[in-house]
Amino acid sequence: MGYTHYWDQKAEPSYMQWFEIMEHFKHLLLHTSMCIQAESDDPSPFLITNDHIRFNGVGDEGHETFDLSRINVGEFEFCKTAYKPYDKFVVFVLILVHNLAPDCYIITSDGDANDWQKDLDQLNAICETEYTLPETI
């Protein structure tokens, strides 16, 4: 199954924007059942740093590693999740990026608003926010 998310980085998020993205994502991780790690075959912890958010699913529940950079302006990136359980964490990060660093990334997906809505609803409930989906979804 080729279910993929795409992002085209147009600008570098400020340190404050990136900090907010990291903090919201960490909050989500504390309040959801985690199914992510460094790589599908590497049980090391996922990576959340001042420049990257990087993770994959666990074992057979992983597919391609999600790696979002704060500093790769001009790069077109993608992550094929095959709609495996860690996909919701990819969607969480991309929704956060869209709302907290709105002019920095153009986000698209093989999925549509119906595919993303349950993850948006969960994110908004946990973070007590009213974030929106990217217009390109």
Each model region followed by its residue ranges:
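Acidic (Asp/Glu-rich) sequence patches and key acidic residues
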Residues: 1-137
